Amino acid sequence: NMSGDPEQEFFADGIAEDIITALSRYPSLFVIARNSSFSFKGRAVDVKQVGRELGVRYVLEGSLRKSGNRVRVTAQLVEAETGNHVWAERYDRYLADIFAVQDEITQATTIAIAPAIADAEQQRAMRKPPASLDAWGAYQRGMWHLSKASAEDNGLAEKFFQRAIDLDPMFVGGYVGLSAVLSRAKGTQSREEALARRAVALDGGDAEAHSRLALALLAGGDHQGACAQAERALAICPNLAAAHGALGVALAYSGRPTDGLAALEACIRLDPRDPSLVNRLNQLALAHYFCHDYEAAVEAAERAIRSFPDFPSPYRWLAAALGELGRTEEAKTALEKAITVSPDSFDFQVRQRPPWFRPEEHSHMLDGLKKAGWEG
């Protein structure tokens, strides 16, 4: 509290306490409790010293200033060992409702910090020789490769996640990551689900594990179970983007695309730099399509294609949406691309009807593709 107003001490402490509570819900973060972190309050201490004394890799520090009915909160995330800034932000707010402002700043800070730490940890792991990695480092290397979405990177991600499990069979992240990799391969749904169930069994309070299980259940056609697991994840960690994403796609494929859209939009808003953004945009396109909002489906699919031109699924939704809009020539071009980018994916998604597709949604997609020129 740098405002000079003793009354703002409670406001500053409230924000700090709420951020500690919110961050502690993220399964990938180890967060020091209030009593220990508050022991540094008001002291001019070196961030490296704080890191050593608390045994943490990152330190979040901030300040509060008040002028009239306005308050300014600044926050910065620092890597304790090096003193390098990982993230910083400033929030200026009117104090009409002090608790609303406290909640708003807490949420804004929390949803920014978790992805920033994830990025920093992946970069840190990539700088280390593979042979020197512990389970956490192997997991982070796996996550880095997983985000690239190429066949080669998927193979490397699988190896690093398996190594994380071998190094620490009780480490939930290894099972979550390996399940995620297997979701990209054919004929692996049962193992994908088993790994996700193992993660949940190891830690029933891990929101990321429940989110992964939701997607594995959806891949097997269990729409109700998928929604239930995603909702459980959100109950544990309301700001976890992956949980909103899992719920969104599960709802979209369950005949509730409007509700699915709201969850998917929340997911993208919470983590706009998500390495899985192409999946989110593709899911946004299909949810809009199922809502019969074909213009919005085209927009979402084109956004995905601009960022990830080698990802096949958005071309399929683009072709179907353009077909429904009667934009035949554009639809034919998109259809050709959907087939040529990945013939196997097109065959699986279109001709075979994967388990996550209910007959009614699948027929709806086929109608659009036929209008785009697909002859079956």
Language-model features, listed with the residues they occupy:
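Generic structural signal of hydrophobic/aromatic residues within well-ordered alpha-helices
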Residues: 122-125, 335, 365
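Acidic, proline/glycine-rich low-complexity intrinsically disordered segments
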Residues: 1-325, 330, 345
